[in-house]
Amino acid sequence: VWSQLLHVVNTFLYSFTNDYNAIQSNDSDDRIVVWVGSSGIGGRDQMQVLQQMVNDSFTPTYKIDVDVQLVSNGTLLPSALAGVGPDVAIQVENTLPMNYGMRNAVKDLSGFKNFDDVIQRFDQAAVVPYCFRNKVFALPDTYSFPMMFVRLDVMDSLGLKIPKNWNEFKDVVSELKKKNMEAGLPHDFNTFSMMLFQNDISVYEDDGIRVNFDEPRAVKVFEEYTKLFTEYQMQLTYDAVNRFRTGEMPILIADYTLFNHINVFAPEIKGQWTFCAVPETINGNVSNKTVTGTGTATVMMSGCRNAENAWTFMCWWSDTEAQLSFSRRIEAILGKSARYSTANLKAFEQLPWSNDELRAITEQRSFAKGVPEVPGGYMTSRYYNFAFLSVVNSSKNPVEQIRKYAKLIDKELEGKRLEFGIMS
């Protein structure tokens, strides 16, 4: 008892002098600094897992010290430009690597040793947002995509079948409305791009010369998509887990990671629900159930003091063994709801999924596609959202709105290409 009390007192006193943002520090020239964003795997539990893995595996094997630091989001680029950034940053938002790369803030990884082998660890769609004109500015950390969640018991009691395509989905929405019930569908850019992909329409022409939103087929897609929220009156905001748990929303489309939250926070409906591929679009005799994949990434900063050591860390961190170890430890500490959506394919397959769960996720992932990041592309999702809300909230004409904002997006794309000296 006295030894435990002494430990508590010492820990309390030490807390006044310990820097909890820097877990380990070493002045060696070979040392690398790794930043982790606080909204990614940030948090003391997760950081301790990463540091323990570095201490147990990475440093003894490669003789490279690692200073892991927890930082607030939004500090990466300003710090890098000020010359005080890290060597490596992990859990970086997927829209940032290409934009940082165009500003020479992160390194192109494609020329590093064994790059071609390392990149095979991931689904190629997961790499798409980090590439531009044969340059690769990041390695994927996490990767996720939407799936359809269904309350089997509720659907059965209503005499409804799981919809296989969007026409059937609309029919289900109509029937649910008659019972004062709802279906859930996100209205974000990733969902709209999914609709475009299912109609064989790319978001951009070539490598970002222009956006394809005003292409006639894309205009039609936008028009039909917004009808789900105007004519069918689908909700814009809702608590997915709670509405699904109560049965008020017996069918919804959401990121596959919602599976973990439902299992933890709604154990009373175990065995009464499932998840499967999203509805497909049927054009003639051709069906398409493509979804949009997204995630986070690891980057090497341009001001990196020792690129070889930084690359060694990135290879180790993205490898199957490290990703599986990290995933298992995090889940053991924080529970099933924190299951890590690793982008490493082999590590993902070894997580504690059932055969049916793994089969369903793997099938949907095979239809996942990444949205390319292009100079000026940060305005694409913003202007899409403006167009969507103007139709749904202000009853504006969908054709006019999507064409209007497509022109504004094109103007931004053109401006950024001129700024970076990119020839068409």
Question: What annotation goes with each model-predicted range?
Answer:
Residues F132-F137, D141, P146, N167-V219, ...:
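Extracytoplasmic/periplasmic solute-binding protein
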Residues V278, R328-F386, S390, L418-S424:
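Long, aromatic- and glycine/proline-rich binding clefts that accommodate carbohydrate-like moieties
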Residues S72, Q91-T95, D188, A254-I262, ...:
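Beta->alpha turn/N-cap motifs
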Residues F16, Y20-Q24, N94-M147, L152, ...:
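Hinge/lid segment of periplasmic solute-binding proteins
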Residues G74-V88, R103, V154-M155, D171-L176, ...:
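Short helices/loops that flank or line small-molecule/ion binding pockets
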Residues V1-L96, S395, V399-S424:
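Conserved N-terminal structural module of periplasmic/extracytoplasmic solute-binding proteins
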Residues A266-R339, S366-K369, F386-L389:
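Extracytoplasmic/periplasmic substrate-recognition and gating elements
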Residues G208-T237, V278:
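Glycine-centered hinge/linker elements that transmit conformational signals in sensory
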